[in-house]
From Swiss-Prot:
Its main location: cytoplasm. It comes from Thermococcus sibiricus (strain DSM 12597 / MM 739). HAMAP family: Cytidyl_kinase_type2. It is found in: Cytoplasm. Keywords: ATP-binding, Cytoplasm, Kinase, Nucleotide-binding, Transferase. ATP binds at residues 12-20. It catalyses: CMP + ATP = CDP + ADP; dCMP + ATP = dCDP + ADP. Disulfide bonds: none annotated. This is Cytidylate kinase. Belongs to the cytidylate kinase family. Type 2 subfamily. Gene3D superfamilies: P-loop containing nucleotide triphosphate hydrolases. Pfam families: Cytidylate_kin2. One of its GO terms (biological process) is pyrimidine nucleotide metabolic process.
Amino acid sequence: MSRKCLVITVSGLAGSGTTTLCRNLSRYYGFKHIYAGLIFRQMAKEMGMSLQQFQEYAEMHPEIDREVDRRQIEAAEDCNVVIEGRLAGWMVKEADLKVWLEAPIQVRAQRVARREGISIEEAFMQIAEREMQNRKRYLNLYGIDINDRSIYDLVINTFKWGPDGVFAIVKAAIDHLYPDGDAGSGANPGNKS
């Protein structure tokens, strides 16, 4: 498939830094940012459920996941987009760059606690429960093992590198794809003519 623009997927578990990276990429390159987690949260709100309740509801209603995935795949048809979601790398098969971010669960729990205004212990328990539910659901629904990182072009430990380091690594990869500095301008990295 010949593409005249860049499509990047950024995936990772809760608190790994996916939103921070996507916002930085969006600001720097002017990419449109599609966030699967926000879609999921909006759907929970529309149904009057907490995120945890909606997570449990989604386990029994596969149409929820399929709708989120449909929106991600649809978004990948746009030019110059960064798509954020745990399964984005799996769903957007022809992405130009697939990134997985990770960090130790203790670090992720601290980040989530700070973001959500809850205790670290509560965040840790929520993350552990959510990851167990998601892994089971993704295996049952799609046959995808969320722990399989083999499809990703980059796997980055955000605890080790921090937001600036992570951005620099991904920027270097994008600049390699677009050596003439044309990322976001609609140029095709494989076509030098």
